[in-house]
């Protein structure tokens, strides 16, 4: 048994961020690595209860803050360091995942990994899962189906290029968070690597795709596309939103029912791999 909370790993550009790992007494040798989404963090909402769910089922569970998500090692919640948020790229997030795997390797021997990515984290789960040998399966929760489609087009893209930065508002904190144009140039430089359709169509690892029926942040069509490319069935969680009825902060002691159903469906997928 092992429980590590708010330890520090070194991610992209040697930036330090917070990480949790729990290994249960009855460990089945498999560790789930959870990747949060855009403007998220490891302790958002009910993610701690997701961790508890899988640990109780015998899985190890690791959740971490991406290195350039706006958090610090002193404060991993919300966005106390907007400059780091502005410097984020998909390559940074991919490097973070690689470093997290190495960090786990230093703590645990002979483990098999599974990645779960929420929203934008689902894209990182697919990109990283394609090449990281310790990853044996990929689960996407309310994930985007394309990185390129999320960028502005036309005059808005030219304005971003000209200014070098644009701003996105966090509805909960009301912060105007910067995004540098390097986010886009990093994508264009690595467009083949970041092509989710290509990954889903060629990867030889099992993929589980789930989406909330009433998701207004990332439309369910994204889930349909990922499932079709992966030649698998989409797991639709009925009558729920992008975060499966969870909110931040989450003060209840139990998972919201849609998120519980998602955990059960994901666990069923993982069990069937054995």
Residue locations for each model-derived region?
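Alpha/beta-hydrolase active-site loop
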Residues: 83-107
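Short beta-strand/loop motif that positions the catalytic acidic residue
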Residues: 202-203, 209-211, 215
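Hydrolase active-site cap/lid region
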Residues: 131-182
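Alpha/beta-hydrolase fold nucleophile elbow
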Residues: 107-118
């Amino acid at each position: 048994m092992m429980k590590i909370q708010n330890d520090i790993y070194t991610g992209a550009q040697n930036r330090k961020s917070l990480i949790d790992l729990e290994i249960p007494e009855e460990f089945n040798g498999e560790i789930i690595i959870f990747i949060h989404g855009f403007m998220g963090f490891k302790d958002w909402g009910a993610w701690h209860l997701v961790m508890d769910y899988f640990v109780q089922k015998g899985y190890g569970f690791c959740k971490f803050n991406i290195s350039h998500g706006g958090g610090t090692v002193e404060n991993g919640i919300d966005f106390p360091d907007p400059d780091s948020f502005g410097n984020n790229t998909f390559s940074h997030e991919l490097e973070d995942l690689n470093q997290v795997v190495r960090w786990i390797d230093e703590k645990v021997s002979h483990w098999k990994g599974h990645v779960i990515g929420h929203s934008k984290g689902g894209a990182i789960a697919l990109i990283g899962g394609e090449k990281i040998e310790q990853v044996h399966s990929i689960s996407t929760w309310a994930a985007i189906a394309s990185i390129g489609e999320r960028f502005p087009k036309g005059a808005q893209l030219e304005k971003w290029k000209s200014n070098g930065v644009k701003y996105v508002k966090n509805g909960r904190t009301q912060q105007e968070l910067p995004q540098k144009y390097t986010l886009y140039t990093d994508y264009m430089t690595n467009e083949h690597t970041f092509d989710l359709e290509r990954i889903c169509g060629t990867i030889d690892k099992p993929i589980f795709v789930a989406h909330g029926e009433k998701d207004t942040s990332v439309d369910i069509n994204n889930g349909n596309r990922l499932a079709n490319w992966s030649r698998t069935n989409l797991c639709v969680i009925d009558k729920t939103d992008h975060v499966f009825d969870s909110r931040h902060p989450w003060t209840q002691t139990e998972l919201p029912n849609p998120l519980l159903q998602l955990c059960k469906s994901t666990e069923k997928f993982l069990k069937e791999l054995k």
